[in-house]
Every structure is written in C-alpha cells, then in structure tokens.
Amino acid sequence: YDVADDTRRVKLANLLKSYGERVQLSVFECYLDEKLLQDLKARARRVLDLGQDALRLYPVQGEVEVLGTSPLGAEDPAFVVL
C-alpha cells in the first residue's frame, strides 16, 4: 500500500493486521474467501483517501512455495497478498 497520511496509514495497517499476517513493512498475507475480501475492500475504502492513497490486492492462484519459516498455515488456497 501507499498511504500519504500517517493517521490513515496506521489505521490501514491495523485493519490489514486484523485480516492476516504482516510479512513486510507494507505487505500482508491474508487468507480470504470472497465474503471476507469484499468486507476488507469496503472497510479499506472508508480509511483511504482514494484521490491520494493506494491499496493493491493481488490474488494468488495455485500453490505457494515458502522458503524458510512461515507463520501462516491456512488450508484454503485462495488468499490475497497485499
């Protein structure tokens, strides 16, 4: 994500933490079904200034290979990397 305002950035980070795991400073892995994804998008729109900020959502299809340790272990293959 790219959020111009510190207050909005903290709010968005806290929102994303409630859906998944922070893997880098502005990258989160979230295992989401369609309902949760739509909920996350709606809540993010209320936090973001869509004229200044950006949140990118990348659906991941297929297997994910992890080298090293991984705190996530969901069985559902449908997850989104933010």
Model-found features: residue ranges?
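C-terminal structural segments of small proteins and small subunits
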Residues: 46-82
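Residue-level detector of functional hotspots within protein domains
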Residues: 11-16, 41-43, 65-66
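Short, intrinsically disordered low-complexity segments
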Residues: 24-54, 59
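Extended, hydrophobic alpha-helical segments
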Residues: 1-27, 31-36
